A protein has these predicted regions:
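Juxtamembrane helix-start motifs in multi-pass secondary transporters
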Residues: 33-34, 96, 196-200, 261
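Membrane-interface interhelical linkers
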Residues: 1-32, 36-71, 81-91, 139-168, ...
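Short hydrophobic/aromatic, small-residue-rich stretches within specific transmembrane helices
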Residues: 7, 200, 262-266
């Protein structure tokens, strides 16, 4: 019960983060977003590491784990977050969300080759649904720049080429980073919530170091500081929301199985759509095709992360179908 509640809270804050990003990039730039959101997360993780008593792990963490976590930090928080902000600025959180969910496919592919994961029929169905979500969204007249006769033009016109390009880059970065993190944590005995928080702190520190190098140039620092209070507010929200959501996810995984936590966290698309409707209605595209695309991707993500055993135990399936679902490769 506790694990499910923590996972649901993580999904909700991930959704809030997407909405806050959208508001921030309306008036600010991607570089400004990185300059605010990354430093905001560091003190939160430091306090969490102190409270959890996980800082002692720094003494026993192998050098290889430090390098893997640092690589994950640069990949996720610099490359991935930059691409996330660029894609969200170009075409909104609703359209990029299904593409970002395809990062699960990247994670699964890497896990099969490096962490001895397997491919099952249920996961294949999930991959097909995840890939189909963005295609369904493209059927929207508003996305294609068309409106019905007599209808007013959409307030927001997406830049599809830029948006999808950076959304794919974001999915690749977000898909690779969990493998780096998992590989790093496999090198230590304690892989509970404390280890995860310390791993996040190392990853954030590496990303912050790269950010500092970027801001050393005076013109970059001036640009980062040239934002109004409203923009700084929304970017600060993104830093807080994404940091809290990551910690909640690690806490959920510490007290509940992955098969319970991961499908619940994938419901972030529902929260992203709901919060976006209330906060960013004029800056997003909401129509039937887009919502169907979002829903298809969420179902696919849940299928991709659920274990076959949990499905067979939950649903009374015919023996032949249950046997088919248990097929695995390699």
């Amino acid at each position: 019960m506790l694990g499910g509640m923590l996972a649901l809270a993580a999904a909700a804050t991930f959704g809030l983060n997407s909405v806050a990003i959208r508001r921030g990039v309306l008036s600010g730039t991607v570089a400004q977003g990185l300059a605010v959101s990354i430093p905001v997360g560091m003190p939160i993780l430091l306090v969490a590491a102190l409270v959890s008593g996980g800082l002692g792990l720094l003494k026993i963490l192998p050098a290889s784990s430090f390098l893997l976590l640092a690589g994950a930090g640069v990949t996720h928080f610099i490359i991935g977050r930059y691409a996330n902000y660029r894609s969200t600025k170009a075409m909104g959180a609703n359209l990029v969300g299904p593409v970002h969910s395809s990062s699960l496919i990247m994670t699964l592919a890497l896990a099969i080759f490096y962490l001895d994961e397997v491919l099952t029929p249920l996961r294949v169905i999930g991959i097909i649904l995840i890939l189909g979500g963005p295609l369904l969204s493209l059927c929207s007249p508003a996305v294609r720049g068309k409106t019905e006769t007599g209808a007013s033009p959409a307030t927001f016109t997406p830049k599809l080429l830029e948006g999808y390009g950076f959304a794919i880059l974001c999915a690749l970065a977000f898909g690779a980073s969990p493998i780096l993190i998992r590989s790093a944590l496999l090198n230590i005995e304690d892989t509970g919530a404390g280890a995860g928080i310390v791993g996040g702190l190392i990853a954030y520190t590496a990303a912050f170091s790269v950010l500092i190098l970027y801001l050393l140039r005076p013109k970059h620092l001036r640009h980062a500081l040239e934002m109004d209070r409203n923009t700084a507010k929304w970017f600060s929200y993104t830093g807080v929301f994404v940091c809290i959501s990551q910690m909640l996810r690690f806490m959920a995984l510490a007290v509940a199985p992955v098969t319970v936590v991961s499908p619940i966290v994938q419901s972030t698309g529902v929260f992203r759509t709901l919060f976006g409707w209330y906060i960013n209605r004029e800056h997003e595209i909401f129509d039937g095709w887009v919502l169907v695309g979002v829903a298809t991707t969420i179902v696919g993500a849940m299928a991709l992360t659920m274990s076959v055993g949990s499905v067979v135990d939950l649903v009374d399936l015919p023996d032949g179908l249950a046997t088919f679902l248990r097929i695995s490769w390699p």
